[in-house]
């Protein structure tokens, strides 16, 4: 491993807010994104859009001759301004990026995504039946951007931001990868949580003597759930794990390209999460969260009847919050909360030849707002 692993990295517990801080190097309230981009309260800190007088990292890099590319999630524009007629000033091309391919909202279907190329809404280039998946498509597009850049302007520096739909819900991944995890999580979130803490202590991610807090509020012991619920919950977690592995495989294609094109030693790579694991699946998870969001209950019998559909094109799955608790080991609470489980997140920095202990650990406090000024420096 060549990336430095930061154990004290902090975010803002939600996606839009963290992205605003990441892109500006400032507190998210200070730039107008105190909450999600979906909402505009009218108050200066909560406009659902990065303030026009605050430069983004892409805008600052452009001033130094960089070409800037973005693929994937944006979620930094008010929903009322994401239609085909704009306004476009808050879209990626209006905030310093030269090319954009991705989606504007918080999430999208991985098999039927709501895609935008630059400033134009477009149809997805494939379907589940033709083998399409958004993660692969985004990395394909990122590679096209980089190859085109190198062919046309090899002496011009570039900045690429890759924001996958993974691992935000809906958790959708190829069936063979989901099947791979069929038994991986059969022991449940309590056993998984204990095992992860032991591994964290062994590898130095947390200090010796670190103890788990009690289960989060409303999370029941795995043993208190019925066997058929165990099967459902394990399958939902398997879909999440498969989606993560699927992205990891395709991210590897991007790193391989940097290596093959002899750019890897000149490229700093940062991999981070914008918030902790999500509690939005509730106590039992969802096979079709859209029904629940529209006030249509999803009874346990209905979930169980659709076990084989989980992760496929006709589902919008999310895992139970017991798995989110395990994902945030050894911290309390989740995404949306200002507890450790919401704001302490992974950061890996790969800077070949620039640090003496590539693959080492860093335990100091750092915040997502530190990244833009550090990159600029």
Residues covered by each model-derived region:
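Formylglycine-dependent sulfatase
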Residues: 1-377
């Amino acid at each position: 491993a060549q990336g430095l692993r930061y154990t004290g990295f902090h975010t803002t517990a939600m996606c839009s807010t963290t992205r605003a801080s990441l892109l500006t190097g400032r507190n998210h309230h200070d730039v107008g994104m105190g909450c999600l981009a979906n909402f505009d309260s009218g108050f200066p800190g909560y406009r659902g859009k990065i303030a026009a007088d605050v430069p983004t990292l892409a805008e600052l890099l452009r001033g130094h001759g960089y070409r800037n590319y973005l693929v994937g999630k944006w979620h930094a524009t008010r929903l009322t301004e994401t239609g085909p007629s704009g306004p476009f000033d808050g879209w990626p091309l209006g905030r310093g990026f030269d090319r954009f391919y991705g989606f504007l909202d918080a999430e999208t279907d991985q098999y039927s995504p709501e895609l935008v190329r630059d400033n134009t809404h477009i149809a997805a280039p494939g379907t589940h039946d033709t083998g399409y998946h958004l993660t692969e498509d985004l990395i394909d597009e990122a590679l096209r951007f980089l190859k085109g850049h190198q062919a046309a302007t090899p002496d011009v520096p570039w900045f690429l931001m890759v924001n996958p739909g993974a691992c935000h819900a809906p958790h959708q991944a190829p069936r063979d990868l989901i099947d791979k995890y069929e038994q991986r999580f059969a022991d449940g979130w309590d056993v998984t949580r204990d095992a992860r803490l032991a591994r964290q202590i062994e590898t130095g991610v947390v200090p010796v003597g670190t103890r788990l807090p009690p289960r989060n509020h409303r999370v029941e012991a795995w043993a208190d759930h019925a066997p058929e619920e165990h099967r459902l919950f394990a399958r939902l977690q398997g879909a999440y794990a498969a989606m993560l592995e699927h992205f990891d495989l395709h991210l590897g294609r991007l790193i391989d390209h940097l290596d093959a094109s002899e750019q890897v030693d000149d490229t700093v790579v940062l991999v981070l999460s914008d918030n902790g694991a999500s509690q939005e699946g509730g106590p039992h998870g969802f096979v079709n969260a859209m029904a629940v969001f529209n006030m249509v209950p999803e009874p346990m019998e209905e979930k169980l009847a659709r076990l084989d559909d989980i992760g496929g094109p006709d589902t919008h799955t999310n895992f139970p919050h017991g798995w989110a608790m395990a994902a945030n080991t050894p911290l309390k609470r989740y995404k949306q909360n200002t507890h450790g489980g919401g704001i302490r997140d992974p950061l890996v920095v790969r800077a070949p030849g620039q640090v003496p202990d590539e693959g080492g650990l860093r335990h100091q406090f750092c915040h997502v707002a530190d990244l833009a000024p550090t990159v600029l420096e």
